[in-house]
Amino acid sequence: VSVFTHPFANASGVGSWPGIAARQAAEVVVGELAGALAHIVELPARGVGADMLGRAGALLVDVAIDTVPRGYRLAARPGAVTRRAVSLLDEDMDALEEAWEAAGLRNDGRVVKVQAPGPITLAAEIELSNGHRAITDPGALRDLAASLAEGVSAHRAGLARRLEAEVVVQFDEPSLPKALGGGLSGVTALSPVAPIDEEVAAGLLDACVLTVGGEALLHCCAPGLPWDLLQ
């Protein structure tokens, strides 16, 4: 559970839940957190397209993903993985809307949270076609961040309309400390991943928040979070 100082909430969930039942999870979230900060859940146990990075596949604009043995890779065009990610996100949104409606919370002044990987973590964990991390290519890094921001903005606005509620965005950045500290592994020992410049990272985060609009949170469960960068 995350605790915030902003007056719109005093508690929320991180986002990821066990199990595969979207409606049951949504009912629990709305029942327990409707008076705090309810959120759309992620159910990674459902498999491909349901985890944090897979969720991004449903949000990216004009960018597709596919699976590889190590995780996800950028793809030339949308395929089964992207379609599955979109379908799972639609299911989660439907489940939250049904629970929200059943609880009588439409236009009730409550706030809802959505989660998405942040631009640094997304680029650090998704591969290019050559197998290297997308973060190693400055152009790919910028394009991914822009696509993510546009997609999350549309996702936020769409859910706000469906629930008739304010929606805030949580960017998950578990890979941010490693990306800044040069701790990301390369394809081989001879191709290390250089640390990303702090100004570049801050600029991408700021751009995402600006594009998304409204309130935004950053969540990182990894040690070594650079607080000075985020202030």
Protein language model features and the residues they cover:
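Alpha/beta catalytic barrel-like cores
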Residues: 1-117, 121-136, 214, 229
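Residue-level signal for functionally critical sites in structured catalytic/ligand-binding pockets
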Residues: 19, 39-52, 92, 110, ...
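Conserved active-site and cofactor/substrate-binding residues in soluble primary-metabolism enzymes
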Residues: 20, 24, 87, 91, ...
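An active-site-proximal structural segment forming one wall of the substrate-binding cleft
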Residues: 82-105, 140-167
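A solvent-exposed, charged loop/short amphipathic helix patch at secondary-structure junctions
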Residues: 127-141, 184-195
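Active-site loop segments of alpha/beta catalytic cores
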Residues: 147, 151-231
